[in-house]
């Protein structure tokens, strides 16, 4: 790079912090053009500016930032593209950039180090493929060498921290000891620089997943714990907080090793942190004990599972939370009294953290928590100080989830009159907390909420509170959801039929009217009130008994009228905020429409279906219909209507088909695409061969979706399931697509699970279940409904060996879900009825026999039934083989 070009680039970089918008835009455009014209040379030039200490701090920082932004992205796909691009650079340019950014470490006078970030992001690309082998040792040397400057130690530790944060697990395994040596060296209390200690402590936090082998060795673990505990006592609050964060993470990762340190170090350190007036310190102290509780809740579940299976648990709880309970609860309830009147709902505070900690403590310690919190609640629930009233109510609401019903019910019933009275408290914060507590009561101990002694009084205060401040009204809406669920559960019988009446029937119409009014409040956007009110409305409708049906019908018409009114408002939208609210409202109305339609009686559906489809088609046709959220909810509303109308939906297909295809093609918004695919299956099942005229276009789009490389993987299982629905519905009309679909199913069925990739395994299992559903639909569709299988099913015979091998592979890999087992068993039964004795040699296999035997022992009724049926069908064809 010539000096003139370098000077020009430096000048441009310095303009990236200019207050002048024109200069900023000009600089942005120049840098984008430079990157587009020759990216390797551009990044090399940036690295040369970064390494040159004669350049201004602004230019160097901007160069580092530009360099970093061309190496990584928050979007995983883009980040992968950047990594692939880096590998294609000429090796001499890659090496020069690496040398420059490494040489720049410790030479900056700004924090954090841009060079450290650049080094880390190149390392994340290169270390997994064994390039830049000396990097880690070089960074370690910069930290531990006696002559190393403060800036060198700090920036090297920052680089190590960034690498540990982003590198793929396992890559650093052979160098974890060296990394840990450097980190612990930088954390020691003899280190004179707090900047270095902070960078080291942050790096430790990022590297803890890699230190498993070190924590397994007593001496190494003792040394690590000593250094971390020392760091928690540092006068620099940032170091103290970072060290506490390490303890929080250590407790989660290495719980089983913590017993030697708990009484003497961890307990006193974290209790003192909880009591701190520094919010950041207090939050970490509280977080530590929340994590302890989470861990011990999981261990209790594991222990119960082990007992049920007649084996010893792999890990056991040390019951630290129970042991600390009497010391923790006074600190936590005291933190609850420190809430700020102007607290932003999104700001995490010690008071909010204390509430969460009390919840998990109650879950962990159950009834043992009661004597430690009840005196505080009784003493303060009617305190003249609103903070103490609120803390008492918050404590009460927070511990409900862990208590046994026998303990909980009398406590709640005794508290009900006071709680109802507090719904009219002068403090909005107290009323908000009370409304939240009632929501929890309705959810956790519903029988207390619908107790006729208090029900009418409770409903009166709920309805009045719907007119309160948005935050209070929103919590009341969530309480209505719990109340609605409680009333329904109390009334519904074992057969699952809709009950004739329930506890809320006398008040139902009034509640619905008030909720509809709440959805229309001008301040409905605050505290998510409008959404909460519509959710409550949907839940009330969903859980309505037969004697409330007239109100449901009227509500359907109200929602339909609102949908039409809202669409007429579209011309009045002036800005992005209005558009966002408009789309949200349409999506809520579509969701509510689904809820009311599910309760509409089948014979009443044709009377309203024209009006509903007209409204939905108008919406699809409007610009709002292009919004992903609106499209998704609208497709789900159509799906509910299809379920109601059955084959009568056919008259809407000519007008609706193009919008359905538009949704199927919208794979960029995968939720919309999934909703459209699900709806496609629903329509085919309802209309059967009436869908044949549309099959070609729809199948073409679905097949294209499966071959589209950028489509979100969530869509693929849905498409495969849809193939099954389509094949089942149109029978031999599916034959033109059979070969291509079977090829796709074969490719999908060959995907292998990976023991180290939980997410991928979850996806593969979902895919496999969809494959089984597709095969089942195809077999049933081609077989026909007659007792004797139609000859069309013989098109599947060449594929039977692969299909049975696929089922055997599922069986051999183990850990099969009940739903997968049921799908496989049902499919095996269908194969038997379709192919008879000729199938027996493929099914006469110990793997299949064992697989179905396991299913017969399942606790899930459907799985048990289908596996039993499949075994009978196999025996039947075996008998036929013997008698032939």
Curated annotation (Swiss-Prot):
Domain Importin N-terminal, chain residue ranges per copy: 27-107
Annotated stretches, region: Ran-GTP binding: 340-425
GO BP: chorion-containing eggshell formation; mitotic cell cycle; NLS-bearing protein import into nucleus; protein import into nucleus; regulation of nucleocytoplasmic transport
Annotated GO MF terms: nuclear import signal receptor activity; nuclear localization sequence binding; small GTPase binding
Chief location category: cytoplasm
Gene3D superfamilies: Leucine-rich Repeat Variant (1.25.10.10)
HEAT repeat start and end residues: 8-37, 39-71, 91-129, 135-166, 176-208, 218-253, 259-308, 320-366, 370-400, 408-444, 455-491, 505-542, 549-597, 605-645, 650-687, 692-730, 738-782, 792-835, 837-878
Record region (IAB): 335-348
Gene Ontology CC terms, in alphabetical order: cytoplasm; nuclear envelope; nucleoplasm; nucleus; P granule
Disulfide bridge map: none
SMART domains linked: IBN_N
Transport as UniProt keyword: yes
SUPFAM superfamilies registered for this protein in UniProt: ARM repeat
Key words of the record: Cytoplasm, Protein transport, Repeat, Transport
Subunit structure: Forms a complex with an importin alpha subunit. Interacts with the sesquiterpenoid juvenile hormone receptor Met.
Record-stated family: Belongs to the importin beta family. Importin beta-1 subfamily.
Role noted for this protein: Required for nuclear protein import and mediates docking of import substrate to distinct nucleoporins. In Drosophila, may not function as a snRNP import receptor as it does not interact with components of the snRNP complex such as snRNP U1, U2, U4/U6 and Snup.
Name this protein carries in UniProt: Importin subunit beta
The species this protein was found in: Drosophila melanogaster
């Amino acid at each position: 790079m010539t000096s003139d070009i370098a000077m020009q680039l430096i000048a441009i970089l310095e303009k990236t912090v200019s207050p002048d918008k024109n200069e900023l835009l000009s600089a942005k455009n120049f840098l984008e053009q430079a990157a587009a014209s020759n990216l390797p040379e551009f990044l090399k030039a940036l690295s040369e500016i970064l390494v040159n200490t004669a350049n201004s701090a602004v230019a160097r920082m901007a160069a580092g930032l530009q360099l970093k932004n061309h190496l990584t992205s928050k979007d995983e796909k883009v980040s992968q593209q950047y990594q692939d691009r880096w590998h294609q650079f000429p090796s001499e340019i890659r090496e020069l950039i690496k040398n420059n950014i490494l040489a720049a470490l410790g030479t900056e006078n700004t924090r954090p180090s841009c060079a450290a970030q650049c080094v880390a992001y190149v390392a994340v690309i290169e270390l997994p493929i064994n390039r830049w082998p000396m990097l880690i040792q070089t960074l370690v040397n910069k930290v531990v060498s006696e002559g190393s400057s403060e800036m060198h130690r700090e920036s090297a530790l920052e680089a190590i921290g960034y690498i540990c944060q982003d590198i793929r697990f396992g890559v650093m395994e052979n160098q974890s000891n060296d990394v840990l040596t450097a980190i612990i060296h930088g954390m020691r209390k003899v280190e004179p620089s707090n900047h270095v200690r902070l960078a080291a402590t942050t790096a430790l936090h990022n590297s803890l997943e890699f230190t498993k082998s070190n924590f397994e060795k007593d001496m190494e673990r003792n040394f690590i714990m000593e250094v971390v505990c020392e760091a928690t006592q540092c006068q620099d609050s940032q170091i103290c907080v970072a060290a506490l964060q390490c303890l929080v993470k250590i407790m989660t990762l290495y719980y089983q090793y913590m017993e030697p340190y708990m009484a003497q170090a961890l307990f006193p350190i974290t209790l003192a942190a909880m009591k701190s007036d520094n919010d950041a310190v207090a939050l970490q102290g509280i977080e530590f004990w929340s994590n302890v509780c989470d861990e011990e809740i999981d261990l209790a579940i594991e222990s119960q599972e082990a007992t049920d299976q007649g084996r010893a648990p792999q890990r056991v709880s040390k019951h630290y939370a129970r042991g600390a309970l009497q010391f923790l609860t006074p600190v936590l309830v005291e933190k609850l009294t420190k809430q700020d009147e102007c607290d932003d709902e999104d700001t995490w505070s010690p008071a909010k953290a204390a509430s969460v900690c009390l919840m998990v403590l109650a879950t962990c310690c159950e009834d043992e928590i009661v004597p430690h919190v009840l005196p505080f609640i009784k003493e303060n629930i009617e305190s003249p100080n609103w903070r103490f009233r609120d803390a008492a109510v918050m404590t009460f609401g927070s511990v409900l989830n862990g208590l046994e019903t026998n303990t909980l019910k009398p406590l709640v019933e005794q508290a009900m009159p006071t709680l109802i009275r507090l719904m009219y408290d002068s403090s909005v914060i107290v009323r908000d907390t009370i409304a939240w507590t009632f929501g929890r009561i309705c959810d956790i101990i519903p029988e207390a909420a619908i107790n006729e002694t208090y029900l009418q009084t409770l409903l009166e205060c709920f309805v009045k509170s719907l007119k309160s401040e948005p935050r209070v009204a929103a919590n009341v809406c969530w309480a209505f959801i719990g109340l609605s669920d409680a009333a329904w559960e109390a009334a519904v019988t074992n057969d699952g039929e809709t009950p004739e009446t329930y506890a809320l029937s006398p008040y139902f119409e009034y509640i619905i009217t008030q909720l509809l009014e709440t959805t229309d409040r001008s301040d409905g956007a605050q505290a998510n009130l409008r959404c909460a009110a519509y959710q409550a409305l949907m839940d009330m409708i969903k859980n309505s008994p037969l004697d409330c049906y007239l109100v449901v019908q009227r509500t359907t018409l109200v929602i339909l009228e609102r949908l039409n009114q809202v669409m007429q408002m579209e011309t009045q939208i002036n800005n992005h905020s209005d558009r966002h609210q408009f789309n949200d409202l349409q999506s809520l109305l579509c969701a509510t429409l689904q809820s009311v339609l599910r309760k509409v009686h089948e014979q009443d559906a044709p009377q309203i279906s024209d009006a509903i489809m007209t409204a939905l088609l108008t919406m699809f046709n409007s610009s709002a219909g292009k919004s992903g959220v609106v499209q998704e909810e609208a497709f789900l509303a159509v799906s509910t209507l299809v379920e109601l109308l059955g084959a009568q939906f056919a008259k809407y297909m000519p007008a609706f088909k193009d919008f359905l295809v538009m949704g199927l093609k919208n794979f960029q918004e995968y939720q919309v695409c999934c909703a459209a695919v699900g709806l496609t299956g629903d329509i085919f099942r309802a209309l059967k061969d009436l869908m044949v005229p549309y099959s070609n276009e729809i199948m073409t789009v679905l097949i294209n979706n499966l071959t589209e490389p950028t489509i979100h993987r969530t869509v693929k299982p849905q498409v495969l399931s849809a193939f099954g629905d389509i094949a089942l519905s149109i029978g031999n009309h599916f034959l033109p697509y059979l070969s291509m679909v079977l090829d796709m199913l074969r490719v999908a069925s060959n995907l292998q699970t990976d023991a180290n990739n939980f997410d991928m395994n979850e996806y593969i299992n979902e895919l496999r279940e969809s494959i089984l559903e597709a095969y089942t639909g195809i077999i049933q569709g081609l077989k026909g409904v007659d007792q004797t299988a139609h000859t069309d099913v013989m098109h599947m015979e060449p594929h039977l060996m692969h299909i049975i091998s696929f089922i055997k592979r599922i069986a051999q890999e183990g850990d099969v879900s009940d739903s997968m087992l049921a799908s496989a068993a049902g499919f095996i039964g269908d194969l038997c009825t379709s192919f008879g004795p000729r199938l027996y040699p493929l099914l006469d296999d110990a793997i299949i026999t064992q697989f179905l035997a396991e299913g017969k022992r399942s606790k899930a009724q459907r799985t048990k039934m289908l596996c039993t049926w499949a075994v009978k069908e196999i025996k039947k064809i075996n008998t036929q083989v013997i008698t032939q």
